[in-house]
């Protein structure tokens, strides 16, 4: 099952998370050339902070700032964890 947070609005992102056999990050961004590595770093550091692995993270970015990406990811992960409690 997939869990998501965010939107396709300008300056936002849609993050979708699901369980996986390995940690995999897929990023689609209008600013990928300039900020693709930074977006990936924000996602990886957030997963590391939360000690999470084996997830598929899909990020459709429309120019979101780092704190927006992080908060959307945390919200999607929270929705997923609530389902399994």
Go through each PLM region and give its residues.
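N-terminal intrinsically disordered, cationic/polar leader segments
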Residues: 1-85
């Amino acid at each position: 099952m997939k869990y998501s947070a965010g939107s396709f609005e300008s300056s936002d992102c849609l993050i979708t998370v699901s369980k996986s056999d390995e940690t995999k990050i897929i990023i689609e961004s209008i600013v990928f050339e300039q900020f693709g590595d930074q977006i990936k770093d924000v996602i990886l550091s957030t997963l590391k902070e939360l000690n999470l692995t084996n997830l598929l993270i899909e990020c459709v970015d429309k120019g979101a700032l780092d704190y927006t990406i992080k908060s959307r990811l945390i919200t999607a992960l929270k929705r997923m964890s609530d389902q399994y409690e």
